[in-house]
C-alpha cells in the first residue's frame, strides 16, 4: 500500500512540474484565467503532497517502532517457549531415567512379595520359597568392582519369619545355593554384596549348572555391561508340570526344572535384547544352545519383561535375537 501511494505522489509531482513548465505558454495563448485557477489547485495539491509525505514519514517511523516491538515480543515468546520445552524435556528424561527398566510387570496368578535390596529387586514366592525373579541394572563401572566375595548366606530379614529360608535348608541337599543376582555383579558395594547373599536370592541348582553354563552366562553379562555401558538383567526359576522335587529342613523349597535370564541393552541406536533358558541338569549347556528371544522366555514363564520401554521398541527387540550382536 505504501509503495502505491508513493508512486501516485511521484506521478502527481511530475504532473505539477510539467504544468509549471508550460503555464507561461498557456498565458500567451489567452488561458490566463485557467492558469490562475490551476495555480490554486496546484498550491493546494502541493500542500496535500507535503502533508501526505510528512504523514508517511511519521507512519513509517511508527511502523518501524511497532515492527521492532512485535519482533521483541516474538523473540521473548520463542525464548519462553524454548525454555518451557527444555524444562518439559528435562522432566520427561528424568521420569524415564527414574523408571527401573529392568523390572517386569507384576505377576497376576503367582504369589509374589516385592523386596528391594541394595543393587537389585526381587519377587519372592512363598509357595516355592524361591524368588520368582531377580532384576538389576549392571553398569560398566559396577562390572569393574573389586570387593571380595562375602560368602555369608543369611535369611532375608525383609521376609516373614515363616518364609525365611536358611543356609541349613540346603545342607546335604545335593544342590548348590545358586545365586540369581551373582556376587560378582555386586563387587561395587559392600552392602550390595552382603544383600545378594540373602537366601531370598538363592535357588537350588545342580553344581554342573551353577559352576558351568550359568556361570559362563554371568561372566558374559559383565562383559556386555562394560561393552554396552550398562545392561538390564532379569533371571529366575522355571517350573514345569505340577509335581516338583523339594529340599529343605524347616521349609519346603521347590527345585526348579530350569532357569531363565533375559538381558537388555539400551545403547542408543543399538538397542537389543536376548533371552536364555538353561535346564537344571548335569548336562553341559552352551550359550549358543540356550539363547532365544525374550518373547520365548515370556511364553515359557508367563512374565512380561521390559515393560517400561517404548512399546514399538519392545516388540522389535523382544521378537528376535542375535548372539553375534553381543559378542
Listing of model-derived features with the role each one plays in the protein:
Residues 2-327:
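Domain-level detector for secreted/extracellular nuclease and nuclease-toxin modules, and
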Amino acid at each position: 500500500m505504501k509503495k502505491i501511494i508513493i508512486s501516485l505522489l511521484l506521478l502527481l509531482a511530475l504532473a505539477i512540474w510539467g504544468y509549471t513548465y508550460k503555464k507561461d505558454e498557456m498565458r500567451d495563448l489567452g488561458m490566463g484565467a485557467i492558469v490562475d485557477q490551476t495555480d490554486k489547485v496546484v498550491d493546494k495539491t502541493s500542500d496535500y503532497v507535503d502533508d501526505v509525505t510528512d504523514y508517511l514519514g511519521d507512519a513509517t517511523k511508527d511502523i518501524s517502532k511497532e515492527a521492532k516491538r512485535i519482533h521483541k515480543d516474538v523473540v521473548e515468546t520463542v525464548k519462553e517457549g524454548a525454555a518451557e520445552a527444555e524444562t518439559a524435556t528435562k522432566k520427561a528424561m528424568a521420569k524415564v531415567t527414574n523408571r527401573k527398566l529392568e523390572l517386569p510387570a507384576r505377576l497376576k496368578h503367582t504369589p509374589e512379595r516385592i523386596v528391594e535390596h541394595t543393587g537389585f529387586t526381587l519377587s519372592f514366592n512363598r509357595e516355592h520359597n524361591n524368588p520368582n525373579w531377580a532384576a538389576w541394572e549392571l553398569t560398566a563401572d559396577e562390572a569393574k568392582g573389586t570387593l571380595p566375595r562375602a560368602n555369608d548366606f543369611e535369611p532375608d530379614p525383609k521376609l516373614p519369619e515363616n518364609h525365611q529360608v536358611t543356609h541349613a535348608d540346603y545342607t546335604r541337599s545335593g544342590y548348590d545355593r545358586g545365586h540369581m543376582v551373582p556376587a560378582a555383579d555386586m563387587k561395587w558395594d559392600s552392602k550390595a554384596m552382603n544383600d545378594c547373599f540373602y537366601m531370598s536370592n538363592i535357588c537350588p541348582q545342580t553344581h554342573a549348572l551353577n559352576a558351568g553354563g550359568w556361570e559362563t552366562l554371568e561372566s558374559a553379562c559383565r562383559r556386555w555391561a562394560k561393552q554396552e555401558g550398562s545392561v538390564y538383567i532379569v533371571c529366575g526359576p522355571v517350573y514345569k508340570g505340577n509335581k516338583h522335587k523339594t529340599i529343605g529342613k524347616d521349609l519346603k523349597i521347590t527345585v526348579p526344572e530350569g532357569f531363565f535370564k533375559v538381558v537388555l541393552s539400551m545403547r542408543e541406536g543399538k538397542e537389543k535384547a536376548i533371552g536364555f533358558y538353561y535346564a537344571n541338569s548335569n548336562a553341559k549347556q552352551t550359550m549358543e544352545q540356550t539363547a532365544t528371544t525374550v518373547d520365548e522366555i515370556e511364553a515359557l514363564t508367563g512374565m512380561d519383561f521390559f515393560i517400561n520401554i517404548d512399546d514399538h521398541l519392545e516388540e522389535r527387540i523382544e521378537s528376535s535375537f542375535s548372539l553375534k550382536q553381543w559378542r
